Design a protein with these regions (language model features):
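Short glycine-enriched loop/turn motifs at secondary-structure junctions
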Residues: 1, 31, 48-52
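C-terminal structural segments of small proteins and small subunits
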Residues: 47-75
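Glycine- and other small-residue-rich loops at beta-strand/loop junctions that grip anionic moieties
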Residues: 6, 34, 59
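Conserved short beta-strand edge segments in small beta-sheet-based binding/regulatory domains
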Residues: 29-33, 72-75
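Electropositive phosphate-/nucleotide-binding environments in soluble metabolic enzymes
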Residues: 8-11, 39, 60, 64
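Short glycine-/aliphatic-rich beta-strand segments at the starts of folded cytosolic domains
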Residues: 1-8
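Conserved beta-strand core positions
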Residues: 4, 26-28, 54
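Amphipathic alpha-helical interaction surfaces in cytosolic regulatory modules
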Residues: 11-27, 35-50
Length: 75
């Protein structure tokens, strides 16, 4: 597992994030406090506190393409 932090500041950011991570076949979770949701679930993401940074957990060894596509969200 690999992890990094992101920030999603608008509804469009959430939509773009979900569309991007949905292209990848490996599991990706989002963690906010004690809550863990599937990063490919738009409804799950909206259940999180989006005013704070969110931890992304990627369950893959090689995910450089994902990082390059998400670089605008990474903090």
């Amino acid at each position: 597992m690999n992890a990094f932090k992101i920030i999603l500041q608008s509804v469009n950011d959430v939509k773009d994030f979900v569309n991007t991570v949905s292209k990848f076949n490996y599991d990706i979770d989002l963690v906010s406090g004690r809550y863990v949701v599937d990063a490919k679930s738009i409804m799950g993401i909206f259940s999180l506190d989006l005013t704070k940074p969110i931890e992304v957990r990627v369950f893959a060894d090689k995910f450089d393409n994902l990082l390059s596509e998400l670089k605008r969200f990474i903090i």
